[in-house]
Amino acid sequence: MSPLTRIALALAASAALVLALTACGPAHVAGYVPKRRDYAVPDASGQDTQAASAGSTWREGRAASMLYTDARALRENDLVVVRIEEIADAKRSADTDLTRRSELNASIEAFLTSLSTPYALKGGADSGFKGLGSTARTERLTATVPAVVRKVLPNGNLFIEGHRVVLVNAEEQHFYISGVVRPIDIDQENGVKSSMVADAEIEFTGRGVLSDNQRQGWLSRLLGWFWPF
């Protein structure tokens, strides 16, 4: 076998390997492991559950039992759409004004008999401080993330968890949400607002070219740590 043939076969094998790897799914910017939240179920010892009577057509937790409402997520592995609309607006200001004044008056009259006139001693001190400070921060996050019902709590509430990964031009964005929702808060379109999610954990992170360029370099961080001014 000639050297050119060997090179051609090696290139063909490499190309086939690349195609096989890319066919398995989208390539992440770095290693990606979906987050899983270990949610501790609250103690339900004080909650009573009422069993359906014999022969009843209504069963708790069954979508078919909701005769006058649309089908909604009620059981494990059901899907529910979470509409994330988070707005944070925080402002804080402080004004400090301190003033202090002290005076001291003393006179010497008969300490020494040779003094014909008394001598007076006076002293005083003034100090003051005034400081002003203010801070403001506004954040807004809007997204739509489908979530899966991971657990059905004893009181009927649902623990949901959802991921969403978007890859555009070597920039990878990750959406994550988890929390507890009430079935009554799920609307007719099988969706719920993030403001109705209790014990919520909402994350929006990114990695890739843009995220790397926005991050300060290690040398700049090191110099900033040592520089006292």
From Swiss-Prot:
Its main location: membrane. The keyword Protease does not apply. PROSITE patterns: PROKAR_LIPOPROTEIN (PS51257). One of its GO terms (cellular component) is cell outer membrane. A lipid is attached at residue 24 (N-palmitoyl cysteine). InterPro entries: Flag_Lring (IPR000527). A lipid is attached at residue 24 (S-diacylglycerol cysteine). One of its GO terms (molecular function) is cytoskeletal motor activity. Keywords: Bacterial flagellum, Cell outer membrane, Lipoprotein, Membrane, Palmitate, Signal. It is found in: Cell outer membrane; Bacterial flagellum basal body. Residues 1-23 form the signal peptide. It is a lipid-anchor. Pfam families: FlgH. GO terms for biological process: bacterial-type flagellum-dependent cell motility. HAMAP family: FlgH. Belongs to the FlgH family. The basal body constitutes a major portion of the flagellar organelle and consists of four rings (L,P,S, and M) mounted on a central rod. Assembles around the rod to form the L-ring and probably protects the motor/basal body from shearing forces during rotation. This is Flagellar L-ring protein.
